[in-house]
Regions:
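Generic secondary-structure signature for well-ordered alpha-helical cores
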Residues: 31-39, 52, 77-81, 101
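Short glycine-rich phosphate-binding loop at a beta-alpha junction
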Residues: 41-49
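Acidic, glycine-rich active-site loops and adjacent beta-strand->loop/helix elements
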Residues: 5-10, 49-53, 89-91
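Conserved active-site and cofactor/substrate-binding residues in soluble primary-metabolism enzymes
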Residues: 20-24, 28, 38, 42, ...
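Phosphate/ribose-phosphate-bearing ligand recognition and processing surfaces
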Residues: 52-65
Length: 131
């Protein structure tokens, strides 16, 4: 699971914070999963978030949430990882929950109720490696 803060890593000149940016976090977590034995052909993704929590008028360039969502989708596409489900945009934050033994991904908007977003399949085998 990744929680990105910004879409592009260009501000991270030293490359010290790859998990903070969509364009580096997605490849980094996929690389780590492969190192642990996962097969990229079996990976699937579900994403949630990308809300515009702060209003800045009509400037879409300041809509970091939308830019994050677009960057995550682009990174997944570039890596060939299918996007199974998404719940993005709007103006309300979300909480995401992953049940690792079933692959259930649930999302809850702030002040709302939890709902199933996707079932990605069994995530962990008994050895802890992606099944």
């Amino acid at each position: 699971m990744v929680h990105v803060v910004l879409p592009k890593s260009q501000m991270d000149k030293a490359g010290e914070l790859p998990g903070k940016f969509a364009d580096t976090a997605i490849p980094a977590i996929v690389q780590r999963m492969v190192e642990m034995g996962a097969s990229t052909s079996r990976l699937k993704a579900a994403i949630a978030g990308g809300a515009q929590l702060f209003q800045f008028g009509v400037s879409s360039s300041l809509d970091v949430g939308a830019r994050n969502s677009e960057a995550v989708i682009a990174a997944l596409r570039e890596l060939g990882i299918p996007l199974q489900a998404k719940d993005v945009g709007g103006s309300v934050g979300r909480t995401l929950r992953l049940v690792s033994d079933t692959g259930l991904v649930a999302v809850r908007t702030i002040g709302g109720t939890e709902r199933e977003l996707a079932v990605l399949g069994k995530i962990l085998s008994s050895s802890g490696v992606a099944a």
